[in-house]
């Protein structure tokens, strides 16, 4: 591939946000919510606003009159027509490029169904006419972005959480843990426990308000029971201004919400392991010789790891589970909200990577299943 070839596009399609930009950049250029919305009823939209479907920020802004839908649930694309609209919006409206002249690197959650990545591959070549593409596993890209090739990544986004042990650049699939509990579940849990304040949040528009409350006010308690006791003794509330100008007070919900990450039973997932247990279980499924290296490189990734105190609490909980001779080290890169994208940008700009792209001619020869032999 000559140097004159157009820069590759890197697109990290999360359940909650699309992060897109160009290979070699140090941050994504465009971020928008992974949502599409047709109007709830045709009459509600007048004149120039009358279009079939809104995507991303525009859908967010008009959420009152739209029926918002997420095409990606728990990291898996559930509606391909809507997903195509999201990609079209990414290429033509956000990045303002013609995908026919750019290689495209996409990301996916580990343990995704095989047909999911085949369908992605097919759409890229057949609908968008890309010259070449690649599908990278999100957690592996995050580890690259932290400058490591060995470690265990705890990646928690909006739709899915997984712990992925990686040794010298290769993920260890037998030891991956995946739980369908992440940011969106916390938002729903917060909606539920905020009802105690007398407020009700039911519409998709109100759900976005609760997501903002979660991101701005919630934090992880280092010691949950102690925090509960203290909050019962003295009322500690934080104000939050609602879009209509009213102010609501948020109390112990601020730390009760993220507690579900360590105790999923709070949100009805009785069998699911918490963040600390997932990490511990993944490490224990690995060869005994690599465990110490993994304990020493527990790398956080994704927006749901951004809560205040989460790295400290995770380290404390894993210490309680691990052998006494082990001192776990939790690494929380400040840019971890975008580390999957950053890893994709780094990987796709390496000269050694250029032979890894799936080209159009390889696709024509082998069909969508080529993705399993070239992307692993």
UniProtKB/Swiss-Prot annotation:
The entry's cellular-component GO terms read: ciliary plasm; cytoplasm; cytoskeleton
List, alphabetically, the PROSITE patterns matched: ACTINS_1, ACTINS_2, ACTINS_ACT_LIKE
Report the domain of life of the source organism.
Eukaryota
Q: Which SMART domains match?
A: ACTIN
Q: Any idea which GO molecular function terms this record carries?
A: ATP binding; hydrolase activity
Name the major location.
Answer: cytoplasm
Q: Enumerate the catalysed reactions.
A: ATP + H2O = ADP + phosphate + H(+)
Q: Where in the cell is it found?
A: Cytoplasm, Cytoskeleton
Q: What is its EC number?
A: 3.6.4.-
Keywords annotated in UniProt: ATP-binding, Cytoplasm, Cytoskeleton, Hydrolase, Nucleotide-binding
Which InterPro entries does its entry note? Actin (IPR004000), Actin/actin-like_CS (IPR020902), Actin_CS (IPR004001), ATPase_NBD (IPR043129)
Q: Would you identify the family this protein belongs to, as annotated? A: Belongs to the actin family.
Role of this protein: Actins are highly conserved proteins that are involved in various types of cell motility and are ubiquitously expressed in all eukaryotic cells.
Q: What name has this protein been given in UniProt?
A: Actin B
Species annotation: Trypanosoma brucei brucei
């Amino acid at each position: 591939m000559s140097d004159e070839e157009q820069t590759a596009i890197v697109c990290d399609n999360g359940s909650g946000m699309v992060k897109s930009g160009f290979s070699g950049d140090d941050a994504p250029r465009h971020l928008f919510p992974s949502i599409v919305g047709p109007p709830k009823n045709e009459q509600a939209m007048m004149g120039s606003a009358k279009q079939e479907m809104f995507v991303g920020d525009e859908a967010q802004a008009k959420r009152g009159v739209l029926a918002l839908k997420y095409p990606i649930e728990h990291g898996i694309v559930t509606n391909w027509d809507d997903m195509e609209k999201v990609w079209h919006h990414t290429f033509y409206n956000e990045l303002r490029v013609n995908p026919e002249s750019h290689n495209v690197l996409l990301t996916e959650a580990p343990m995704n169904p095989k047909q999911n990545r085949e369908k992605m591959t097919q759409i890229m070549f057949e609908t968008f006419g890309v010259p070449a593409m690649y599908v990278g596993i999100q957690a592996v890209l995050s580890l690259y972005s932290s400058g490591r090739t060995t470690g265990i990544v705890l990646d928690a986004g909006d739709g899915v959480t997984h712990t992925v042990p990686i040794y010298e650049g290769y993920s260890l699939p037998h030891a991956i843990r995946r739980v369908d509990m992440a940011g969106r579940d916390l938002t729903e849990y917060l909606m539920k426990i905020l009802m105690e304040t007398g407020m009700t949040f039911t519409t998709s528009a109100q759900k976005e308000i609760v997501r903002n409350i979660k991101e701005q006010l919630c934090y992880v308690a280092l010691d949950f029971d102690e925090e509960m006791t203290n909050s019962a003794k003295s009322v500690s509330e934080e104000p939050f201004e609602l879009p209509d100008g009213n102010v609501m007070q948020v109390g112990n919900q601020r730390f009760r919400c993220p507690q579900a990450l360590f105790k999923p039973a709070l949100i009805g997932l009785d069998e699911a392991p918490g963040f600390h247990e997932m990490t511990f279980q993944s490490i224990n499924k690995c060869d005994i010789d690599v465990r110490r290296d993994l304990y020493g490189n527990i790398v956080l990734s994704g927006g749901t790891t951004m809560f205040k105190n989460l790295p400290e609490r995770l380290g404390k909980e894993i210490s309680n589970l691990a052998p006494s001779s082990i001192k776990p080290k939790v690494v929380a890169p400040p840019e971890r909200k975008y580390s999957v994208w950053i890893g994709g940008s780094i990987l796709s700009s390496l000269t050694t990577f250029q032979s890894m792209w799936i080209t159009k001619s390889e696709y024509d020869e082998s069909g969508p299943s080529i993705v399993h032999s070239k992307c692993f």
